């Protein structure tokens, strides 16, 4: 269970770190991210802008909490909560027929849709699994090879998550 926890922890930390980097890579990128939240009209404009800032802060908190060994359970909880909020927002927007590009990782022009909901649910399940694995791993001692394998699996998973829009376009075109 220890290696499963490490994989889930690294996966979520990597995905959120890449998401943050894509959103804050420049003033225009951050503006596009905030605008993509506002244009969904889930909340009033001012509240949507504050929600965009809060979501970015929650992503950053997830990365920090997952990185520190004594805050891992809280990191998983914050990650799952953040993913739940993001998924809920996407679902509300889809029900209202509103579309905006997914600026989750930066400059994508793919509109938010069902694949993004599924992606977020899989990531949330990874967070819940990681929390359960953390609780079950107790005082287990990690072997370097096991840690390396878990980190490689997390890196592959993060790559698939981040490039999901491109992969879907490639295989559905």
Region annotations inferred by a language model:
Residues 1-173:
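Membrane-interfacial helix-loop segments of redox and metal-homeostasis proteins
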């Amino acid at each position: 269970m220890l290696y499963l926890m490490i994989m889930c922890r690294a996966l979520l930390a990597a995905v959120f770190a890449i998401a943050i980097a894509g959103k804050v890579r420049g003033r225009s990128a951050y503006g596009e991210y905030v605008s993509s939240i506002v244009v969904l009209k889930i909340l009033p404009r001012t509240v949507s802008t504050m929600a965009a800032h809060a979501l970015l802060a929650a992503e950053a908190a997830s990365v920090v909490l997952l990185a520190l060994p004594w805050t891992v359970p809280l990191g998983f909880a914050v990650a799952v909560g953040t993913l739940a909020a993001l998924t809920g927002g996407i679902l509300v927007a889809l029900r209202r027929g509103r579309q905006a590009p997914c600026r989750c990782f930066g400059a994508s022009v793919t509109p938010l849709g069902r694949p993004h909901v599924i992606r977020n649910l899989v990531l949330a399940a990874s967070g819940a699994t990681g929390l359960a694995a953390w609780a079950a791993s107790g005082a287990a001692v990690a072997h370097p090879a096991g840690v390396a394998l878990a980190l490689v699996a997390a890196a592959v998973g993060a790559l698939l998550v981040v490039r999901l829009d491109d992969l879907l376009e490639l295989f559905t075109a």
